Amino acid sequence: MKMKKSLVALCLTAGLFASVPGISLAEVNYVPQNTSAAPVIPAAALQQLTWTPVDQSKTQSTQLATGGQRLDVAGITGPVAAYSVPANIGELTLTLTSEVNKQASVFAPNVLILDQNMTPSAFFPSSYFTYQQPGVMSADRLEGVMRLTPALGQQKLYVLVFTTEKDLQQTTTLLDPAKAYAKGVGNSIPDIPDPVARHTTDGVVKLKVKTNSSSSVLVGPLFGSSGTGPVTVGNTAAPVAAPAPVAPKKSEPMLNDTESYFNKAIKDAVAKGDVDKALKLLDEAERLGSTSARSTFISSVKGKG
């Protein structure tokens, strides 16, 4: 028995460092396999959840307000998202994203990984999911990458996403759109305050599954067990079909400082005779919700700016 425990510990330690992306070894200050900080969830409560299967073919998206589930357990606040992932396709890379919405709020996710017997195997607290700045194809978001190695014989893993009362007391500082734009085009970064997103129980979380060949967190017992077989978990839901595309909603009005930044940049571009740049600034400002950029552009071109 001592030999078995030592071998398991060795596998878990070897997988730790690859499970925390983008940090040095000196910065590792928690162990994903240590699930003692995770809420204790009775097996009966887990079996009542509907676990949505996720495979490599697409990203699974859940709107918590409408697609989340209730789990009345101490340490969990608001709706949860529950997914099942195939464990017989090799090592896995799970990317979980929580998008910041237009009201400047965001769901701060915690993730509990369970093996096919519904035994907690890894815990990733909300601090693991860090703020990522918006890009060409992505919005402001909290995001984390989890690399997992299912033990031999595991058929599926379970991924439970939730938030806590402690998370709701915290906030996330975002990057102001004007700063993001200036950074993207190589302009000087304006000295304006960044918006702050409050943490809520609502939001959109997305889970993407890929196979992975690097070291990772071992999930499930390494050796055979005389225990009971896999637990049948409620009714496994079919993957939810993606909704039909809808026309994008009109952007929320931008902050005064952001509006002023774009208006000044438009005036400066017109004054220098760079109308193309002014038009690009106008398009970007209106995309972000500006209500005065167009009139600023017109008056500047007419010599009234």
From Swiss-Prot:
Q: List the disulfide bonds.
A: none
Q: Which GO terms describe its cellular component?
A: periplasmic space
Q: Which cell locations does it reside in?
A: Periplasm
Tell me one Pfam family matched here: MalM
**Biological process (GO) annotations?**
carbohydrate transport
Give the matching InterPro entries. Answer: MalM
Keyword annotations for this protein? Periplasm, Signal, Sugar transport, Transport
* Signal sequence annotation: 1-22
The protein's matches in NCBIfam families, at most eight in alphabetical order, are given as: PRK10564.1
- Tell me, what does this protein do in biology? Not yet known. Might function in the uptake of a still unidentified substrate.
Q: Which family does it belong to?
A: To E.coli MalM.
What is the protein named? Answer: Maltose operon periplasmic protein
Task: Supply the source organism for this entry.
Answer: Salmonella typhimurium (strain LT2 / SGSC1412 / ATCC 700720)
